[in-house]
């Protein structure tokens, strides 16, 4: 049995499909209101803030994947991430199962230094601190050999379906709704977004490869990084038309944050949009040289087709 904790997000859904396709037919989907991605999926409604719920959710599980998402609220992240991680660690210990933790880069400092698996977790923003607390708990449990676990870390998402992320929301969703695409701060700095189907495929591969445990892995991204200007130029090329986009400066975003809670919550992350954001996944590519990473050009094509953007 392989169990996905937080199965209704885009990562959890794609992970469930990948696991069933290539690794395991016994799959349990856990969430507050889980929904099947395949008729044979097992469903288990649980609140991961409740230790007994979490223990029951992992009964008879061999590998657990923690892909849960929390509301985009700094106070909730700072309060709840460490509780969830403590509960999941204890539940894995009780049920003697492995853990694959899907993490993001919020705990990294927002500078232009290349991000690797050894980059310190040193961000001082509330969301970053919440994620640091969770990761630190797991790293300590791994070091103390309390649990057999692995951390899979990913940068900002872009992808088809219900993928959430700045690039999807500000570029592709706006194009889909015949609105002007927007980018934050600068269009001439390099980005390293990850294609969500690649993230899920890579996490399934890591989870089912025994020698990957006890480590942190950066999930694979295209190394041919694009600026937002280049990204939108590629969209123009594929659509065969000009796209006029708008760059939102800090003052505009700050003013907007007084009227938009999601934008207010995003202010913590703004520094990374003013610099080259280089997320290095060479460790994964060295270990798994046959894994096919989706190019940005192909990822854009898939999203444009999925969103029916003409």
Task: Indicate residue ranges for each PLM-predicted region.
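Mid/C-terminal beta-alpha module of Rossmann-like enzyme folds, strongest
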Residues: 2, 202-266, 281, 292-296, ...
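N-terminal Rossmann NAD(P)H-binding glycine-rich loop of SDR-like oxidoreductase domains
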Residues: 2-22
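SDR active-site strand-loop-helix element
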Residues: 5, 30, 67-68, 101-104, ...
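NAD(P)H-binding glycine-rich loop region in Rossmannoid oxidoreductase-like domains
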Residues: 35-95
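Conserved Rossmann-fold NAD(P)-dependent oxidoreductase catalytic core, especially the SDR/UDP-sugar
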Residues: 86-131
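Conserved beta-loop-beta element that borders a ligand/cofactor-binding pocket
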Residues: 104, 136-161
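Glycine-rich "substrate-gating" loop/helix at the edge of Rossmann-like oxidoreductase active sites
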Residues: 155-165, 185-197, 221-223
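A conserved pocket-lining segment of Rossmann-fold NAD(P)-dependent short-chain dehydrogenase/reductase
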Residues: 173-194, 206, 213
